[in-house]
């Protein structure tokens, strides 16, 4: 069942990526800029959301609460 779910989600992402790239080349630079700004943003303050890839300012993420520690 897990394998089927992963395959389904992968197919959805591929379909979404394909349809969003059709006929929208003029917005390509804008999407690239948005992605770069997300990659270069600062750390997440205490109490902010964190997950598998935590970027907490305190370098500590409470995984059970999904928030950055103080």
From Swiss-Prot:
Which positions form S-S bridges?
43-57, 50-61, 56-68
What is the annotated signal peptide range for this record?
Answer: 1-17
Pfam families to which the protein is assigned, alphabetical: Conotoxin
Question: What keywords would UniProt list here?
Answer: Disulfide bond, Knottin, Secreted, Signal, Toxin
User: What does the record give under GO molecular function?
Assistant: ion channel inhibitor activity; toxin activity
Domain of life here?
Eukaryota
Q: In which tissues is it expressed?
A: Expressed by the venom duct.
GO CC annotations, alphabetized? extracellular region
Quote the subcellular location field of this record: Secreted
- Region of interest: Disordered: 19-41
UniProt-listed InterPro entries: Conotoxin
- Those residues forming the propeptide, per the database entry, are 18-41
Asked if Secreted is a keyword of the record, the answer is: yes
Please state what the annotation says regarding this protein's domains. The presence of a 'disulfide through disulfide knot' structurally defines this protein as a knottin.
Q: Which family does it belong to?
A: Belongs to the conotoxin O1 superfamily.
Name this polypeptide is given: Conotoxin AbVIC
Give the organism the record lists.
Conus abbreviatus
